[in-house]
Amino acid sequence: MEVRDALYIIFGYLLGSILFARLGGLIFKKTDITAESPDKNPGTMNAFTYGGFRCGVFTLCGDLLKGFLPVFLYRSGELPENPLMLSFVMAAPILGHILPFYDIKHGGKGIAATFGCFLGLLPHWTPLCVLAGIFIFFSCVVKINPNYYRTVATYILAAICTVWLEPNRYIVFGFLLIAASVLAKLFMSSEEKEHFEVKLAWKH
């Protein structure tokens, strides 16, 4: 690992540790909005629900940016001697979001940050399209409820599809690191889980 690699990994982790839902709540609502939500998750959905539109947009943009910036900047510079380092740069902001250094027990799930990371990989479209496509499929065609199970199913299936479809093995490994981090966060979550349900979207 070279100095540049280490700096981008550290930068990604520290940027990921900024929880924009809490920051947005303080800016727009003068309160910690995550304290109002049942799952206490500092994510985009809770930002919209408990903080309002401006807080939600602020959180969404911040969480996308924290995933995008480290990956985009790292890939825009000189090519690393060890291409494997890209995998760790990809995973760093998501790990920071899930396990922020100042409050390890109260991080987020890393979903929006994952999408931001994959935007930073463009023109490598596979991870972004696979994750978005499967999320849409499980939300609009075969509906999996609640969101906890939908997210678990999406990340597992997206990881499998990316292994199959993405030729760049370092991007694949980065996705696997991200998926493992998100799934570990979900599995260790103490939030109360509603009854698992699968149904076709057009059937009520």
Model-derived segments and spans:
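Cytosolic, membrane-interface loops and tails of multi-pass inner-membrane proteins
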Residues: L23-G56, G107, E192-H204
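Loop-to-transmembrane alpha-helix initiation sites
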Residues: T126-A132, N147-Y155, L165-A179
